[in-house]
Amino acid sequence: MTELLAPVPTPPPPHRPRRWGWLLAVLLLSVLAGVGSLAYRLLYAPNVPAAVDGPAYLYIRRGVGLTALLDSLRQPGVLARPADFAWVARWRGFGTAAHPVQPGRYTLPAGAGNLDLLRLLESGRQDTLAFTLKPFHYLPQLPRQAGRQLSLDTTQLHKLLTNNAYLTRRYGLDTATVRTLFIPGTLRLFWTTPAAAFLDSVAARHRRFWNGRRLAEADSLKMSPVQVAVLASIVQRETAQPTDKPLIAGVYLNRLRRGQPLQADPTLLWPLHGLGTRKRVLNVDKKVDSPYNTYRHKGLPPGPITTPYPQALDAVLRPAHHNFVFFCARPDGSGFSDFSETFAQHKAFARRFQHHLDSLKIRR
């Protein structure tokens, strides 16, 4: 009898690893790592170099678009990778109507990435600068001075300074006296401060200077702040020596009390546009036809001849008390003056000083 045997099962093939799965996983991780690295570089990696000589600033004028801004950022040393910033800016829609470029003066934060820098520029959070207000003799000099430090419209500033109706309504001054509003020193201003706001900031500083004490001191002299500033402008042009300022202020106050003309040489040079350039006053200058000629007209001139520093203003408010009515610069070049009570004494001092100018061949 034949015996039927069950078939012997065939063993399964040996297990082999699925290499394609691993390769796909590795490839996917590599892509994700690359995308993450690219995103980090574009958004967060430092792009603003470390400042070498102090903070770096970015100035953006009104009306500047994205293209002009990117051109300025491509300048050497501004950004490490300007192309990256340009890509991120366009990706976020910066420079469009929804996210316009904000004018201003921005401190570039050292080590900042593109996203932080963009957020700063989008916010318009500019910082202030230290505006240095220097003395000036004539109104047209101020817009030029302001235009060198701020982005304001200098033509508009000049229009405001020469608009009597505006000056009277806003500050109670006119074109002759508006320079008394300006007290040289430092103001904290935005680079984009408009012309009208600039004048308001100057006026605010003026109000802070004229505190209760100074107003009382002016009142004791029977003078207004404007009159104090006019006299202080003359004192400032007469001497740079701090200790002589109260003495010279006392001389002019003595003359005013006695009804004598001030006879201040700097007031002759102002209408001749000679302040800062002329070194000698001649007798012919005393005939100049001007309300600023204090040889021909008694009292104070109609306005200041320069913008006086606080020290000159305080010298008038707190003058030296004496009987001097004359003074003359010393010939030693020290900047000090010799003071006298009589014309005879003064004439001797003046003759000595004139001989000194002659020896130096200073004719004008």
Language-model segments: residues:
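Conserved SxxK-family serine transpeptidase/carboxypeptidase catalytic domain
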Residues: Q263-Q311
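Conserved catalytic or metal-liganding residues and their short signature motifs at active sites
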Residues: T2-Q263, S290, P308-Q311, A315-N323, ...
